[in-house]
Amino acid sequence: MKSWIREKKYECGEYRTVGIYAVTDQEHRQRGRKHKESSRGQKARNKNASMRRYQRKVLANFDKDGFYVTGTYEDAYRPESFEDCVQDVRNYERRVKAAVIRRFGEQRARRLKLSLHAVRNGEKGKLHMHGFAECKGLTTAERREFRAMLEELWRRRVPGTGEYEPLGTCNADRIDVKKILGIDGDGKNGTVGYIYGHSERRCVETRNLTLPEELRAADVEFMHPFLPLYHDKRLTERLAEAAAGVQ
């Protein structure tokens, strides 16, 4: 069976990411109907691929002028179900959009980008929110206002009144791109890996997010027994790992 290594590159805003993985001619055959559940290893690979796609999407849409948002609940306002938490995140997205339009105008609100997740670990895990937010074109002072806005709008209306009360604590921290890339020394998968570490998660996004640009793939054929044609030591190790099925 013929095997080779495929190198795929993606333009993600100011960054370019590279994916290296093994490919066989068997993968190009016509796919039949699925008859059994994927193995645990395949599920892990699928999850890792999904995480990498989302990481590229974050890099393509958010930079150091954006914010990483975390919203938690006071016990009195904790949702009864995961779907209720998802609805709170949708309401939060809607309130942020409306507030940005009122404060900065509709034209700049079109540059508002949000990618938020309702998450929890297991049925008994605590429900909360993580995500990314950025409004392009704001001055330094306006970004401070936007940050305060993000933290204040994690709230709900008091029934029967025009007043609001906070759902819990909301923190909006400046985005650290090293954490997104997983090169800050705190876990190899970074912030996105932390979000994907939750067993349940649902994403709520604005519609104006751009997708990374996929560049033309480059294939490198391997000779038996998987000796790469590249000679760089580190790249050789990575290619050999990919050929062995290591992600």
Positions of predicted regions on the chain:
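Right-hand nucleic-acid polymerase module
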Residues: 1-127, 135-247
